[in-house]
């Protein structure tokens, strides 16, 4: 069954790439990015967005896209791929019984609300350079929290309905501004509430789906009236990148999810923090230079 699926996806990917007239080098670059981000999505529960946004920003810049639009397109495209990687990785986590579905149900309504406000309002209004700086600063802060490894008070528990609604709104809103699956906020939040890190990562992967769907709708609607976008864009989404990355990442996301359950907690947190630090520095630099 897996072989048939791989064959079908390869056929679809080949046809799609020919239709979009993609250069072999670009296909290879996007495929490599998809393989890496898919693995990270499963491993860290971050949807791969923290890695994808900086690289897509760089690739779009090389293609001569308006500097103010490169970051927005990278963020929107990254979020669109999370629809596929979240499904793939959460299945692997669910088989291990690691997903806290009670938290998913509690956070999802707020996530949808926050995502729509962010992607349809603030995202379209902010300049790309401001988004890049915000991305760098916030991700750097999240990385610092992971390295500090502060122990939450033993008595602290997951908040009630209103608290989860508020937390979900913040996760959805901020995720929409940086194109990530919410793991950079939801994982530290759940750890702060004494949820085990492996459960937090698995639950974050499940939250990636409602985050991605709500934000993608907003990116498409808000981007339809924007001038200067490439012909192969759908709203703010760069369609060729979405097709190639999604087709490749769905195979490596389960591998990352498997690795997440084999690594010790401290090492997992350090991997998470290290990835975020490197990419935060790049995006902060990108925002300052433009």
Identify what each model region corresponds to.
Residues 202-220:
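Hydrophobic alpha-helical transmembrane segments of multi-pass integral membrane proteins
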Residues 184-185, 196-199:
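Short, structured loop/turn "capping" segments at alpha-beta junctions
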Residues 75, 201-204, 272:
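Membrane-interface helix-entry/capping residues at the boundaries of transmembrane alpha-helices
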Residues 3-44, 51, 57-72, 86-171, ...:
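Juxtamembrane transmembrane-helix boundary motif
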Residues 41-50, 175-183:
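Short helix-coil transition sites and intra-membrane helix breaks within transmembrane domains
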Residues 158, 177, 183, 209-213:
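Accessory recognition modules or surfaces
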Residues 78-82, 204, 241-242, 246:
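Short hydrophobic/aromatic, small-residue-rich stretches within specific transmembrane helices
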Residues 166-189:
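Hydrophobic, aromatic-rich membrane-embedded alpha-helical segments
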């Amino acid at each position: 069954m897996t072989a048939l699926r791989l064959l079908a996806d390869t056929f679809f990917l080949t046809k799609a790439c020919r239709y979009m007239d993609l250069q072999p080098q670009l296909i290879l670059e996007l495929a490599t990015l998809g393989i890496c981000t898919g693995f990270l999505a499963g491993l860290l529960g971050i949807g791969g967005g923290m890695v994808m946004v900086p690289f897509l920003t760089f690739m779009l810049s090389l293609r001569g896209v308006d500097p103010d639009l490169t970051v927005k397109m990278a963020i929107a495209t990254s979020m669109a791929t999370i629809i596929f990687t979240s499904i793939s990785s959460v299945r692997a986590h669910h088989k291990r019984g690691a997903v806290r579905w009670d938290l998913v149900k509690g956070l999802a309504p707020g996530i949808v609300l926050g995502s729509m406000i962010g992607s349809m309002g603030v995202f379209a209004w902010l300049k790309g350079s401001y988004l890049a700086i915000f991305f760098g600063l916030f991700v750097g802060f999240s990385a610092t929290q992971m390295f500090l490894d502060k122990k939450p008070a033993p008595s602290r528990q997951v908040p009630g309905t209103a608290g989860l609604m508020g937390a979900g709104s913040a996760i959805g809103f901020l995720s929409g501004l940086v194109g990530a699956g919410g793991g950079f906020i939801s994982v530290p939040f759940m750890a702060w509430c004494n949820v085990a890190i492996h459960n937090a990562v698995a639950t974050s992967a499940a939250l990636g789906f409602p985050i991605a769907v709500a934000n993608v709708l907003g990116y498409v609607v808000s981007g339809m009236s924007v001038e200067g976008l490439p012909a192969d864009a759908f709203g703010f989404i760069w369609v060729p990148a979405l097709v190639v990355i999604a087709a490749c990442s769905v195979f490596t996301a389960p591998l990352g999810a498997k690795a997440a359950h084999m690594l010790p907690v401290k090492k997992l947190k350090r991997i998470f923090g290290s990835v975020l630090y490197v990419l935060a520095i790049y995006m902060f630099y990108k925002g300052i230079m433009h």
